Amino acid sequence: MTFEEVCRCVEKELESRWKSADETDRLMRLEKEKRAIMGFEEEAAEYRQIIGEIISNEGIGNGEYPPWYRSLCEGVFNEIYGLAGLAPWAYDETEKYRRSSSAKLIGDRLYCLIDGVSELQPQTIGRQRREQLKRALLMATPRERLEDGFHEIYLRNGIRITIYSGERTKEGQDVIVFRKYIMQRLTFEELVRLGTIEPDAAELFKVMIEIGFNILFAGPVRSGKTTFMQVWQCSERTDLEGLAISTDPETPWHVLMPDTPLMQLVADGRELENMTKSLLRGDNDYVLLEEMRDAAAYRLALDIISTGSHRSKATVHTSDPVNLPFRMASRICERYGGSMQGVIQQIFSGFGYVVELCSREDNRGVKRLKALWEYCYDGSRDLPSAHLICRYDMAADSWQWKYHMGEDKKRIGRSAPEAMRKMEAIMKRLEERNPIMENTVIYPRYYRPQLMENPERTGL
């Protein structure tokens, strides 16, 4: 018996049971089906058991099944209630899928990013099954409408699903993108093991967390920003009260830090604007902002750090940390008005460091700390500056360092003098081992155009 025939046989029996059920039972079954599709273990296990019993009762247990499924029952479940051929990737059923952070379904073709390369997989998903899958996923998220053509959905295990269809795509070439986190232990030691940072950098970052600087995590898409912030935050003190604001429920902080009083809000754009005043009146020790990308998020971040808040953290899409303050200030002033110079000054004086991440060009699955920037503001000279503390050498797969400690950082460090001494010692040791020889300070010309009269000081 072919796999398709087995699936049809099981579906026929399930359809018969559905028709004989009363309205209450149907509603209950429908809710269970939704939860099974979204990956809830209890409901998924129940339907696997039902399918297994049908296969046994019908005497079709010797039927064929595709090699990407672990068993006939598992395959039938995923074809009817699961993610079809995507299931082995979504639930890490092979070593290569455990190493894969993203998958794309383009038309009926499935591509998985494995060791930094998008590989075409043997399993295909036809148009009818894709439409069934989209409808099933959207049933579990009532706010999403199939005709909208663009959707973002999250599975139970945290996988983010982005669906493009309808008029947004070419005929028969609808797209479903899946993203998952492959880092199992959110520790600096794990980042060292993966080669993202060097061992002494892990020690440095832990001391920086102890002191409590405000940090930006920057980089392009799929560079590891969110994961790095998760590692940083998971090393934070658990007795402090925090507030996490994101545009989508991507990071389950209640799971990652169950003992920490960390409130989680999902808001963006106008919703975020409406909440700003109440958020600023809160008594949180720090704030996390995931995916800052518009004027509302930029202004909220600035309002929070301008109150003297420490330990705040944010991720932002950029490959240019030096010009990031200008971009943020431009968006804020265009939307809300104000002085560009004043906003830029607040950014340089409020955020202490930018942790810049990247993927290696020869393997996009490998993440690296690309650079560590220090933002400084000299009030006596009304002069912001960006100092390159660390940079990654792609060819040598190593890092170079340059010691610098701004006066504003020293002031913050007075509350933790022992940690501050340790931080300075680590930075000097790193510089001595592998130094950046040239001058790396940049005085952004966008702050005061007259700096262009002495362009060698701008670094731009």
Where are these regions (language model features)?
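N-terminal accessory targeting/assembly segments
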Residues: M1-E144
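P-loop NTP-binding catalytic core
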Residues: R99-I211
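Conserved RecA-like P-loop NTPase ATPase core
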Residues: I163, F205, T247, V287, ...
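An exposure/low-complexity boundary signal
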Residues: E167-F188, G224-P249, Y447-G459
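Phosphate-binding glycine-rich loops and their immediate beta-loop-alpha structural context
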Residues: E189-Q264
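Switch/coupling sub-region of P-loop NTPases
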Residues: V231-F348, L357-S359
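Phosphate-binding/switch region of NTP-binding enzymes
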Residues: V343-G379
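NTP-binding/hydrolysis catalytic cores, primarily Walker-type P-loop NTPases
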Residues: R368-L460
